[in-house]
Amino acid sequence: MTKYRAKPLYYCHQAQKFIESKQVKQLSKLEQKSLTYFASRHEFDVYKVLFETSLRSKIELQPKVEIIPPKVTICYPNGKYWKADFMTRIDSKPTMLIEAKGVITKDFMLILSLLELNNQELFNKLWLIFPNSIPQNLLIKRLQQTTMKEKVLTLKQFRKKILTMTTR
């Protein structure tokens, strides 16, 4: 599943610059290994906020999250997994599950439902980060009526909250 109308990009930490997908093929295999893939610019911006804090060494990119456990359904006997954007861990325990969203798609609504149903602990650690404004749909309104209301944020709000959390 890809981002809704997003343009993927690669970031070279060493050169501190973006590299377009078509340029990556021209690089050597060694140079390609030093790149970090981001499905959208917004995803990179969220990563950058995390990277600039004390959470830097605790960030896991594209963690595989179980949304249907194995051997529970006929359709998914091996289970079903979703690759979130980021997870932070302390002592190997997940502390934050972060998804950079531009648009809430029907696929994502289904993923959220399955996560809530089958992995409540991780669902409660979920943060949804939007670029400039938080969409006003039924799903978001419901989330904002729960304890998740403080974890459905714009990028600017997220930056402020993370800096406050990590400088205590």
Residue map of PLM features:
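Electrostatic, structured charged patches in enzyme active sites and in nucleic-acid/phosphate-binding
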Residues: 1-168
